[in-house]
Structures are given as C-alpha cells and as structure tokens.
Amino acid sequence: MVSFPVLAAGGITDINPGLTLWTGITFLVLLFVLGKFAWGPIVKMLAERERTIREAIDSAKRERTEAERLLAEQKALLGKAAREAAELARRNQQEVEAMRQELTARARKEADDLVATARKQIEEEKTKAMSELRAVVADLAIDAASRLVKANLDDASQRKLVEDYIAQLPANRAA
C-alpha cells in the first residue's frame, strides 16, 4: 500500500499554531519593510507615471486643437487667396477691355479724322477744279462770243467754230 508522509504526520488540514504565528509575524515584518522602503517609491513612481501620461494626453489635446485651428486658418487663407486671385483676374479683364475699347475708339477717331481730311481735300480739289472749269468755260464762252460777234454765222457754222475751239484747248492737245 502507498503511504503519504504528509497525511501520516497529521495532514494538510492540521493547524500548527507556532507556524501560523511565525508566518503572520514574517508577513507583518515584510509588509512594514515594504511599506517603509518600497511602497513610497512605488506609489511615487506610479503617481509620476500617471502625471506624465496626463500631461501627454493634455499636450496631445492642445496640439490637436492647435492643428485644427491652423488647418482652419490655412483653409481661410486659401479661400482668401482664391478670392483675391479671382478679383485680380476680373480687374485685369476689365483693364484689358477698357484698353481695347480705348484703342478701338482712338483708331475709329483717327480713321474718322483721315476720312474727314480726305473729304476736305477732295472738296477743296473739287472746288478748285470747278473754279478752274468755270474760268475755262468763261474763257471759252467769251472767246466763242467774240468769234461769233466777229463773224455772224449760221447754226452749223457756229457749232463748227465751237468744236474747233474746243479741239484747240490745251487738255485736248495733250490727248
């Protein structure tokens, strides 16, 4: 048969008052030593770690808030820059249109001035030509009248006389 020495000596369930007393005293001494020398630094280290973690969380929250603020600020600046660029493009377009209209008006005025000058010159030349023509016609009429007065001719003779005189004119000679 198998025998168990622990059970033979009284077993596990037997309470030994001396051993229990010394185990309790040892536990209390160990608890006092740990409380005196180890418990304070451990609690201090845990409190420091908790403070460090809390500061890191607070710092992360502040940095996130700052990043969100900067992002909103950047978006606002981009929007402002886009609006300014659109306004600048609009103003440039207006300036280009104004310059185009000014150049068109100036060109139109210059063309109108040239046309007016040309018309004036044409009118002057026409007036001059008409004056010269009147003078020539007057000279012709006077000359024809003087010839008619000198020679009293019939209609056919008068017509022949005028045609001969016209043929003698300088313009017809050059032709």
UniProtKB/Swiss-Prot annotation:
Q: Where are the transmembrane segments?
A: 23-43
Q: Where in the cell is it found?
A: Cell inner membrane
Q: Which GO terms describe its molecular function?
A: proton-transporting ATP synthase activity, rotational mechanism; proton-transporting ATPase activity, rotational mechanism
Q: Describe the protein's quaternary organization and the partners it interacts with.
A: F-type ATPases have 2 components, F(1) - the catalytic core - and F(0) - the membrane proton channel. F(1) has five subunits: alpha(3), beta(3), gamma(1), delta(1), epsilon(1). F(0) has three main subunits: a(1), b(2) and c(10-14). The alpha and beta chains form an alternating ring which encloses part of the gamma chain. F(1) is attached to F(0) by a central stalk formed by the gamma and epsilon chains, while a peripheral stalk is formed by the delta and b chains.
Membrane topology, as annotated, equals: Single-pass membrane protein
Checking InterPro entries in the record gives: ATP_synth_b/b'su_bac/chlpt (IPR002146), ATP_synth_F0_bsu_bac (IPR005864), ATP_synthase_B_chain (IPR050059)
An example Gene Ontology CC term for this record: plasma membrane
What the protein does comes down to: F(1)F(0) ATP synthase produces ATP from ADP in the presence of a proton or sodium gradient. F-type ATPases consist of two structural domains, F(1) containing the extramembraneous catalytic core and F(0) containing the membrane proton channel, linked together by a central stalk and a peripheral stalk. During catalysis, ATP synthesis in the catalytic domain of F(1) is coupled via a rotary mechanism of the central stalk subunits to proton translocation. Component of the F(0) channel, it forms part of the peripheral stalk, linking F(1) to F(0).
Protein name (database record)? ATP synthase subunit b
Origin organism of this chain? Anaeromyxobacter sp. (strain Fw109-5)
